[in-house]
Amino acid sequence: MLGFITRPPHQLLCTGYRLLRTPVLCTQPRPRTMSSSTSWELPLVAVCQVTSTPNKQENFKTCAELVQEAARLGACLAFLPEAFDFIARNPAETLLLSEPLNGDLLGQYSQLARECGIWLSLGGFHERGQDWEQNQKIYNCHVLLNSKGSVVASYRKTHLCDVEIPGQGPMRESNYTKPGGTLEPPVKTPAGKVGLAICYDMRFPELSLKLAQAGAEILTYPSAFGSVTGPAHWEVLLRARAIESQCYVIAAAQCGRHHETRASYGHSMVVDPWGTVVARCSEGPGLCLARIDLHFLQQMRQHLPVFQHRRPDLYGSLGHPLS
């Protein structure tokens, strides 16, 4: 179903395809002074793109097929988008369909990780926390499972999307979601140290810099961007986060029409620390693959030592709102 082509050391494999479709293969040039390791020595990651609906079991079936395909192709880690579990028609349905982390649905994904022998980034689970009974609000929770199906990290989205975009309609995530209170330290995985974030978080460079400072080599932004902000901001933001943090950026995305009133932009992608898009999905559900070259990342940081040139003495009020 998917073919690979051996590339010169300064180029990366870029693949993207829809299920039952011919793959798209391309190469991306790198700065001549920076070399890569032999491609077959590098860990392979898979970025999954889906169209979630309110039907949780149908969504699981779709995600499971993509994860199984990723494992068959040799990926060590598969990334699923925000709201991989479901996208409801309204806030009331969202709350009704939500589950705790120890619920049945996450148990199915744990079993899937075990059976496939693959790590899973579950990019935005509608979590009923321990305070559910008190406030009837959920968390938007990014869960990381290892290949044994164990939860090794969970991050609750800290920046909630309360916006009004002309042509896209209002979004009030805080009406039914509580913000998380902390960042999760980067997690060591077979692909590198992964920093967890979710969708709207990508608009806050402070978060990406904080995760990079804490040791992240890969930043992941599972998302469900809309049809207006997607074309305007999606790729620009992801490339900016990669360049400023000198990390790989992996963004699994929702795509297509979820129900009568909701659609997502798609265009899942992987960006390297130079800011090059090294893999992207085609239109519709499917996955793309990329190899993570940490030697190239270290070279980037050596040749452009921006973290050594930072002036924190000048940035004291950076996290404050505009006056």
UniProtKB/Swiss-Prot annotation:
Residues 1-33 form a transit peptide. This is Deaminated glutathione amidase. It is an enzyme of class 3 (hydrolase). One of its GO terms (biological process) is amide catabolic process. Its EC number is 3.5.1.128. It catalyses: N-(4-oxoglutaryl)-L-cysteinylglycine + H2O = L-cysteinylglycine + 2-oxoglutarate; N-(4-carboxy-4-oxobutanoyl)-L-ethylglycylglycine + H2O = N-(2-aminobutanoyl)glycine + 2-oxoglutarate. PROSITE patterns: CN_HYDROLASE, UPF0012. The gene is Nit1. According to Rosetta Stone theory, the existence of a fusion protein in one genome predicts that the separate polypeptides expressed in other organisms function in the same cellular or biochemical pathway. In Drosophila melanogaster and Caenorhabditis elegans, NitFhit is a fusion protein composed of a C-terminal Fhit domain and a domain related to plant and bacterial nitrilase. Expressed in most tissues with higher expression in adult liver and kidney as well as in fetal adrenal gland and skeletal muscle. Residues 42-294 form the CN hydrolase domain. Catalyzes the hydrolysis of the amide bond in N-(4-oxoglutarate)-L-cysteinylglycine (deaminated glutathione), a metabolite repair reaction to dispose of the harmful deaminated glutathione. Possesses amidase activity toward deaminated ophthalmate in vitro. Plays a role in cell growth and apoptosis: loss of expression promotes cell growth, resistance to DNA damage stress and increased incidence to NMBA-induced tumors. Has tumor suppressor properties that enhances the apoptotic responsiveness in cancer cells; this effect is additive to the tumor suppressor activity of FHIT. GO terms for cellular component: cytoplasm; mitochondrion.
